[in-house]
Regions:
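Single, function-defining residue in the core of a domain
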Residues: 1-170
Length: 170
């Protein structure tokens, strides 16, 4: 893995600081008054930083980005993006400050595929309900079988729906 992708439940300065010593962290950030970031010589919350940062005009996906300092931690890039179908904004944090804002958004978007996979595995492939045991090896075997089911289904879906898999037929 090249990055640690985190949901807003886990993207707090202490966690980010600890993990960033091993891998760069990219995560969604909550709009809370309690978490402060170093910006222009002051410690401000996310909403205050958003008000002060210069936004891009028009309907751009990335509204703004800026580099901030985490308390007792590294520098981080905040990327403000437009929330779909609303006038609201969301904030992403990346400890890889050299990444472009669009790359931060693209990399964080990969997390959504992981969420879809686990929802599918739990709802339709019985990841959590098909087995009840206390043996670690049995749990690993069950999880492996569920993952295999998912791979077979996604492979079949790609064969039947993706035009790129038809080969020389067309």
């Amino acid at each position: 893995a090249r990055y640690v992708l985190m949901d807003s439940w886990f993207t707090y300065p202490a966690t980010v600081t600890k993990l960033s010593g091993y891998l760069p962290v990219i995560g969604m950030v909550k709009k809370t008054e309690k978490v402060l970031y170093g910006f222009d010589g002051q410690w401000l919350n996310l909403k205050a930083i958003y008000r002060r940062v210069r936004k891009k005009p028009g309907r751009a996906q990335v509204l703004a980005s800026t580099v901030v300092r985490l308390k007792k931690g590294p520098a981080a890039k905040l990327v403000f993006v437009r929330e779909r179908h609303t006038r609201n904004w969301l904030a992403l944090l990346s400890t890889a400050t050299d990444l472009e804002a669009a790359d931060v958004v693209r990399i964080y978007g990969k997390r959504w595929d992981i969420e879809v996979f686990f929802k599918m595995a739990k709802q339709h492939l019985k990841l959590t309900k098909e087995i009840q045991c206390r043996d670690f090896d049995a749990l690993i075997a069950h999880t492996s079988i569920v993952f295999l089911r998912y791979m077979f289904l996604s492979f079949e879906c790609r064969l039947s729906a993706d035009q790129r898999t038809f080969g020389d037929l067309f």
